[in-house]
Amino acid sequence: MVDYIVEYDYDAVHDDELTIRVGEIIRNVKKLQEEGWLEGELNGRRGMFPDNFVKEIKRETEPKDDNLPIKRERPGNVASLVQRISTYGLPAGGIQPHPQTKAMKKKTKKRQCKVLFEYSPQNEDELELTVGDVIDVIEEVEEGWWSGTLNNKLGLFPSNFVKELESTDDGEMHDAQEESEVSLTGPTSPMPSPGNGSEPAPGSVTQPKKIRGVGFGDIFKEGSVKLRTRTSSSETEEKKSEKPLILQSLGSRTQNVEVTKPDIDGKIKAKEYCKTVFPYTGTNEDELTFREGEIIHLISKETGEAGWWKGELNGKEGVFPDNFAVQISELDKDFPKPKKPPPPAKGPAPKPDPLAGEKKTFPLKAEDRDEKSLLEQKPSKPAAPQVPPKKPTPPTKANNLLRSPGTMYPKRPEKPVPPPPPTAKINGEVSTISSKIDTEPLSKPKLDPEQLPVRPKSVDLDALVARNSKETDNVNFDDIASSENLLHLTANRPKMPGRRLPGRFNGGHSPTQSPEKTLKLPKDDDSGNIKPSEFKKDAGYSSKPSLSAPSSASKVNTAAFLSPLELKAKVEADDGKKSSLDELRAQIIELLCIVDALKKDHGKELEKLRRELEEEKAMRSNLEVEIAKLKKAVLLS
């Protein structure tokens, strides 16, 4: 059967369950088929209880204690007893083995610790500590926390609030030995026993002490070797009894001697120093407070806590975080200024003998010595602080998610719109569409020949282009041919009186006037309706305007010799072309109006889409912030 100790309170729900409280011990516990439940006996009542509310008590040392007396009663140990009796003699009080078992039980006592600092429990399973209490240590549960019993109550307590008493059990055994010695060897001992409280004589023989050890029951303990151990322990008792007298007589002299011992050891070992790189203010009494650039004498790097060193600064010893200082050599400790580099060393650096002398003669109190020994058992230590970063961390995706919901990312600049091609004026009107197009991110559609409306069949585009190029050349360069260039070769010849040339000019039209009329008629008719800007625009459809110029010039030369019927037909053809051109202009204006309306509608749609996109971006950024907050909340919970 196994025993369990209760760690948490539990109230019974059913009749077959036990009501348990913290610290109670349940006997004769056995496991049940039902998972998570045990059955045991408490206060004469047997019942069930949950296994996660209790903890098993390990009893590995008890069977060994029970077997020890059996092993010691073997014949081999009796032979060693005979050897001792032959050497030291038989004690008058006889041998009584009963006190021996009590002494062994005391020897197998669990280790104890003494409370150095008061502690108030933060949880139900912790012990309340008062300075001076003695706790029986059961086990080390985790780093920094032990389990033990105090005033018959089991619980946890911090290990750095107590000091382990290693010699407590030996002292109790020594006291038990002295009591048993008085009861066994006091009345019949042939020599006075030094354990009665009287001071031993300077030349006293230690024979009675050895006999006392045998009479106490040590004859069953592994031969004569243990006997010598008992002798040394009795001598240590005498030294302990003499130690208070020495302390009273010498006083502070012993303190100076104790102070000089670590200094002598320090001379053998190389001294270590470290320079502070960040200021630090101590939060506890055993911590050092320093500024940046100070030199600390490093005493030890092992303080029982990771991240903390022990050192001395301005005559005060204490601990400090190791990431606030950098270890340096002994040569560099004389140059605490970090701004200037150290000058080249001309020789070995002088040793700080005066400082060492001051350290040797520095008086220390008993309380200071206790504080030194208890540096590792300080109440609490803050975690070593992290060195602040020298430069700000670059923005990450997580940082972008934490932006405020109202902040928007800067927009990328839009691509500049290329300048539209120059547009021509129609009937002297300035086109306002080009100015609107510049403000819109749309490019002006080009009027390709394929997109133009279908012309009537009577309109000849090539003839119109040739004619326009001819008129442009006449207007721009004043290339109107004179009448002399248009006369026939025989016009200046002498004529016969009273006769004219046969049927040449068709009814009395003078040769000098007819060419001019033929030139003026088309010019006057066309110049009233067609402007040079239209000719420039129409000329853009021609692939080779330079080649059509000579042909137009030849047409002008030949038109001077056309008959009136031909001129009339040509004028009618020109009128038909004018009407078709007017239709084309109307269609183009209508198309431009339609395109302008489409652009306006398209711009409105784009603006609406932009607004909706901005709203979606804002909603998404808010959603990402909410998701980040939820993730943090889940991680923290």
From Swiss-Prot:
Predominant place of localization: cytoplasm
Location of the SH3 domain: 1-59, 108-167, 269-330
Matching Gene3D superfamilies: SH3 Domains
Biased composition annotated in UniProt, kind: Pro residues: 341-353, 385-395
Keyword Thylakoid: no
Localization per record: Cytoplasm, Cytoskeleton; Cell projection, Ruffle; Cell junction
GO molecular function: actin binding; actin filament binding; beta-catenin binding; cadherin binding; clathrin binding; identical protein binding; phosphatidylinositol 3-kinase regulatory subunit binding; protein-containing complex binding
Modified-residue entries (Phosphoserine), positions: 80, 86, 224, 458, 469, 510, 514, 580
Job of this protein: Seems to act as an adapter protein between membrane proteins and the actin cytoskeleton. In collaboration with CBLC, modulates the rate of RET turnover and may act as regulatory checkpoint that limits the potency of GDNF on neuronal survival. Controls CBLC function, converting it from an inhibitor to a promoter of RET degradation. May play a role in receptor clustering and cytoskeletal polarity in the junction between T-cell and antigen-presenting cell. May anchor the podocyte slit diaphragm to the actin cytoskeleton in renal glomerolus. Also required for cytokinesis.
Name of the protein described by the UniProt record: CD2-associated protein
Lineage: Eukaryota, Metazoa, Chordata, Craniata, Vertebrata
